[in-house]
Amino acid sequence: MMTRALRVFVPGLLLPAFMSHAGGWAVITVDDLPDYAVAGAPVSLSWVARQHGVEPIHSLSGRVEAVSGNLKANAVARPGEGAGRYVASLTLPQPGNWTVTIRSGFGKSDVTLLPIAAVKAGTTPVALSDVDRGQRLFVGKGCVTCHVDAKIGPNLDGRRFDATYLAGFLEKPRRITPSAPMEMPNLGLKQREIAALVAYLNSDRQVTSR
């Protein structure tokens, strides 16, 4: 039996079904999502918290938590440059796959990123494909928050799009239909990020078997 994978790719993610009925919720958008980290060296994570995915939120007390097996690491966020932006310097102490969660400090509006590989200094892991990178960006850029169960944004489950149209839309979002509940914010995506998201959204990765 086939089922759509946008609901199962991201274990531990707080789905918007709760948030959309909780009164106040935020979308976390990571600025530059790293492909990997170097164990023992600080990696900078910055993000913007937007209330209802639109308005930047100021004066939050956020933090970042990372887990790999029995190992844990954490960092306190500080205000960054620009409205609603926060920065944290996180050090992953040992090589391995680390699950990183950004606690926004705005209610339960947190996001758990897909695992990040920490490698030994001097080691370069295999480069991510556009589809792999796009899958990570779909979470890290906050797309999954609004689209994963179609409660807020359109359900993208199993759909395919013209690549040129989709790339143009991601670069300059606009309201698709007058009945849409809200307009997608412009996330300032880089061309490489747009290409990766287009590759992921149009891939077979969205479909898996039980």
Q: Where do the language-model regions lie?
A:
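Short amphipathic beta-strand segments in non-cytosolic proteins
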Residues: 51, 62-77
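Short, aromatic- and glycine-rich surface loops/edge beta-strands on solvent-exposed regions
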Residues: 97-105
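Beta-strand-rich domain onsets/edges
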Residues: 20-44, 125-126
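Residue-level recognition of secondary-structure-to-loop junctions
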Residues: 80, 86, 90-94
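Edge beta-strands of extracellular beta-sandwich domains
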Residues: 109-118
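Beta-strand-rich structural segments
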Residues: 28, 40-55, 88
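Electrostatic cytochrome c docking/interface patches
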Residues: 37, 119-139
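Extracytoplasmic electron-transfer domains, predominantly the class I c-type cytochrome c fold
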Residues: 145, 152-208
